[in-house]
Amino acid sequence: MLPSLALVPGEPAGIGPELCVRLAQRSRSDAHLIAYADPDTLHSAAKALCLSVRLLDPDQPARAPGDLPLHPIRQAVATRFGTPDPANAAAVIAGLRGAAGDCLSGKLQGIVTGPVHKAVINAGGIPYSGTTELLAEQAGCPVVMMLANAIVRVALVTTHLPLRAVADAITADTVARCLRITAAALQRDFGLEHPRIAVLGLNPHAGEDGHLGREELDIIIPVLEQLRGEGLQLIGPLPADTAFLPQKLAGFDTVVAMYHDQGLPVLKYSGFEQAVNITLGLPYPRVAVDHGTALELAGRGIADPSSLMAATALCARLAARG
C-alpha cells in the first residue's frame, strides 16, 4: 500500500502553488499525494502555467497527469501571485497544522512542504519562527533541522536565531540533543548502522585551544566525549573552514553545524536545486524544499520544481520505511 503524503504549498502568493501543480503533472508510483491548499489558488496557478489540474476528493487516487487529491484550506482573500497578503496567514498555518494533525493521527504517513514567508505570517498576527519549530511544538518532541543534497547532509544545533544569540544557545543539552537525534535518524531513516558524524566547532579554527573562544573546551568537547562513550561515532570539533573539503567529506555521513549560516552556504553552493530540508525527530517524515517563496517568479511559469520533486521522492522513501 502506498504511503499517503500531505503536500502543503506554503505561501499562496509565492511559487509553492505552481510547483504543486507541476508535480501533479507527473504520474507517480511511490505515494498518494493530498494537497492541503486553497482550490482557487491551485486553479489560478494552473491557469498561469497553461496546465490543467483536476482536484479530487482526498480519498480518490490520482489516475492521470493533472489529478490532485485535495484537502481544501480556504483563504481569507484571493491570491495575487507575487503580492502576499497577511490576511492569508491563518490559512497557511491551518494547512501545516491540519497536515501535521493527520500525520499524528495515523491518517497520513508524511508531509512535504513548500516555502513559507515568515514575515507575512507574523504580519498576520501569528507568532512564527519556522515550520520546523511549529511541527515540533505540535508533536511535543525535540527535533533537528537537516538539509541535504547528493553531496552532503548538514544538521543544525541551532536554527533561526540572530547571530548574537547563537553562543548562548550552544549548551551541553542542545549539542547532545542534536547529536542523539541526528544519529538515531541516520540509523532509522537512512539505514546507516554506525553513522560517522562530523561536528563543527563554534569559533574560528574550532577555538584554537581556547584562544578564540572557550565553547569548544567547555561545552562541545565534553559532550563529544560523553556520547562517544555511548557508542556514537563523532569526529571533531572541526574547524568549519576546512571541514567541507571533498577529501574530508568522504569520511563523514553527515556534518553537524552549530548555527544556520555556518553549514548551509556550502550545502547550497554544492547543489541548491536538489537540496531538501528534513525534520529529524518527528514521529513521521517531513521533507521541505530548500528555497524561499521567490515572489518575483510567482505566476510566471519559470520556477524550478527540482527541490519539490526531490523532497517528495525522499519523503515517500522515508514513509515507506515506516
Give the location of each predicted region.
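Conserved hydrophobic/aromatic beta-strand scaffold that supports enzyme active sites
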Residues: 134, 145, 154-156, 286
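Glycine/threonine-rich beta-strand-loop-alpha-helix active-site module
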Residues: 123-145
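Ligand-binding beta-strand-loop-alpha-helix segment within the catalytic cores
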Residues: 147-177
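Contiguous, glycine/small-aliphatic-enriched amphipathic segments in soluble metabolic enzymes
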Residues: 1-131, 172-258, 262-293, 298-322
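Flexible glycine-/small-residue-enriched beta->alpha junction loops
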Residues: 76, 141-144, 148-151
